[in-house]
Structure formats: C-alpha cells, structure tokens
Amino acid sequence: MKKQRAFLKWAGGKYSLVEDIQRHLPEARELVEPFVGAGSVFLNTDFERYLLADINPDLINFYNLLKTEPQAYIHEAKRWFVPENNRKEVYLDIRKQFNQSDDAMFRSLAFLYMNRFGFNGLCRYNKKGGFNVPFGSYKKPYFPEQELEFFAEKAQRATFICASYGETFARAQSDSVIYCDPPYAPLSTTANFTSYAGNGFTLDDQAALADIAEKTAKERGISVLISNHDTTHTRRLYRGAQLNVVKANRTISRNGAGRNKVDELLALFTPHLSSQA
C-alpha cells in the first residue's frame, strides 16, 4: 500500500509516524479516531469501517461534503487555486466572507483555500469563533487533486461526526480499536497551541482522556492507542499502558533558539494490561 498524504496541511499531522502507529494498532474491524485532524492514520490503514470525529465543525462538514459530492467539490475548488487569488487582499476578503457565511459548499471551498494559501497550514480561531490565520505569501500553493480524490473514495467506508472524545468513545463497538491523537501536552509552559476550534486542551483534559482510555480497555474490552509527547507528566498519566518511544521527524521550536527533534510516546491500553493494573 503506497503511503498516502493528507490533502490538508496540518499542525501535528501523523504522516511521519504512520508506520509506527500501524505497528502498534491492534487488529479490529473498525478504527475509531476521536481526534481525526487531517486523517493521515485513516488514509494509511485498512480497516473495514471508520468512525472519525473532531470537535471542529468546519472540518467535519468539509469531510462529509467531500464524501457525498466529490466531483462537484474538486471541480469548483480547483478554480480557486489561481495566481490572482494568491494575494493578501483577496485572502483577507475570502476569510471575511468565510466568517460571515453559513453556506456549506462555500465554507468548505474557503477552508481548503485558506489551509493552502494561509500561513503554515494553521487552523486557528479567535474567541468569537472567527478564523484568524494570516496570509501565507507562498509562491504557488499546491492544489491537492489526487489527495482529495483518494480521500473521497476511502471516505465511503467512514462515518464523520462532530463530537467530543467522550461522545466518540461511547460510540465505539466491541470490534473497534481506538486511536487518539489529542493536542499534545506541552513540553514547556510557553509551547502550547490552544486555539484549535476555539478550545484549549488542558492538563486536566489530558488526564481525563487517559482515564477514559484505561476504563474503556478494562470495562469494555476495547484497546486504545494514544500518541503524545514523551514527558514525565505523560508517562505518569499512561502508567497503566504499554509505552513505546518513537522518534518523530517533525521538529519543535524552543523559544526561537534552534529546532530540536522530540521523542513521542505511543501508549497502548489493552484489556489484558488494564486488568492487571
């Protein structure tokens, strides 16, 4: 199976870790992802069914539209990727229209445009829910036609829902396995990116996720794999899991003083391990 890239640029995307995640995911008929993001794990695994969730309604509405109207969407989206749209004033006008519109097709077209023409592929909202990523000033933003087509075809096996991780866990079935890619625990007090979908993911949220993962394995017999930074705090949270350290290819900037690769944890909660805890 050829490795497949997501069509969205995405902070914390799992493309570089797909092989490690595949290796540690137990076999099941359904993969459940409460934090689907750009979908790299979905795109590079082969389960019969997928339940893919995110708290960002723009993302989920986009995925559902691409699933049901792929040709119409791709045809229209391609028309946005022209040199005259690669200007700051055009970008800011489209961003303004996006924040005022409730039309599903327009919002999905603008979402892809802003992902590719905006700064660094960020997805960020202000406290009022307005998308606020600045213009990216890229020479020629790439139109991901093949990636969109692949996603749309594979999406026929998937159900996309806008839901919290707790709601998504509740919908997992006995033949499911759950993979969680939450907003990562900070390496330092200044390193956290908390404006995704207008909500921060706190240390209390990290603890609650670890708790529900352990309970789901122990009480419902469903295995849960979580990825996160390898820190003293995350090791404490995942002490009831099998811990595997992987080397991430992505880099984390530390106060602008150079970039450092970081270790990541893959924590696997299984019914067997949880019953021994």
From Swiss-Prot:
Annotated catalysed reactions: a 2'-deoxyadenosine in DNA + S-adenosyl-L-methionine = an N(6)-methyl-2'-deoxyadenosine in DNA + S-adenosyl-L-homocysteine + H(+)
One function term, GO molecular function aspect: site-specific DNA-methyltransferase (adenine-specific) activity
Gene3D superfamilies, per the entry: Adenine-specific Methyltransferase, Domain 2, Vaccinia Virus protein VP39
Q: InterPro entries in the record, alphabetically?
A: Ade_MeTrfase_dom_2 (IPR023095), DNA_methylase_N6_adenine_CS (IPR002052), M_m6A_EcoRV (IPR012263), MeTrfase_D12 (IPR012327), SAM-dependent_MTases_sf (IPR029063)
Gene inactivation phenotype reads: Essential, it cannot be deleted.
EC no.?
2.1.1.72
Q: Which UniProt keywords apply?
A: DNA replication, DNA-binding, Methyltransferase, S-adenosyl-L-methionine, Transferase
What processes in GO biological process is this protein linked to? DNA replication; DNA restriction-modification system; methylation; mismatch repair
Instruction: Locate the residues binding S-adenosyl-L-methionine.
Output: 10, 14, 54, 181
What PANTHER family does the entry give? DNA ADENINE METHYLASE
What does it do?
May be involved in methyl-directed DNA mismatch repair, initiation of chromosome replication and gene expression.
Q: Which family does it belong to?
A: Belongs to the N(4)/N(6)-methyltransferase family.
Can you say what this protein is called? DNA adenine methylase
Q: Which organism is it from?
A: Vibrio cholerae serotype O1 (strain ATCC 39541 / Classical Ogawa 395 / O395)
Q: Which gene encodes it?
A: dam
